[in-house]
Regions:
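Alpha-helical scaffolding within the catalytic cores
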Residues: 2-3, 14-26
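Active-site neighborhood of glycoside hydrolase catalytic domains
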Residues: 1-12, 71
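Active-site regions of enzymes building and remodeling cell-envelope glycoconjugates
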Residues: 9-17, 29-32
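Substrate-binding clefts and catalytic carboxylate motifs of secreted carbohydrate-active enzymes
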Residues: 22-130
């Protein structure tokens, strides 16, 4: 359900933090999940649904967005071991009507970050590491 609406029920304790990352404290009965984090924004003119899109944290360009993404994912990987994060969901893969938080534009024509570096970040390995 995401914080701050914690109900202390179910098998998962879920947090939604922007940009994050953050991990709730897991318990013997409940796994910790970061249900939403990220929200890095890079509006691309000519590829937005609306001129009024917003994002949680605006990047200056592709290089800056890639670096921010790498930092977020590196910190997220650290949370796997302490406190024991079981899962994380980056928000969001594509821009939507009113939000420019996607890694790809609304029309799916522009990828907003370096894919090879993002792939390495997603696997928890810096670029150049096997």
């Amino acid at each position: 359900n995401g914080m701050p609406f914690e109900t202390k029920s179910g098998d998962v304790i879920d947090a939604h933090i922007y940009p994050g990352p953050y991990s709730p404290e897991p318990t013997a009965e409940r796994a910790a999940v970061l249900g939403e984090f990220g929200g890095l924004s890079l509006p691309v003119e000519g590829h937005k649904w609306s001129p009024n899109v917003w994002g949680h944290k605006k990047a200056a360009d592709l290089k800056a967005l890639t670096a921010e993404y790498e930092q977020l994912l590196a910190k997220t990987w650290e949370l796997k071991d302490k406190p024991g994060l079981s899962g994380a969901i980056y928000t969001q893969l594509t821009d939507v009507e009113s939000e420019g938080n996607g890694l790809v534009t609304y029309d799916r024509e522009v990828i907003k970050l370096d894919l090879e570096r993002a792939k390495a970040a997603n696997t928890g390995k810096p670029p150049g590491q096997p």
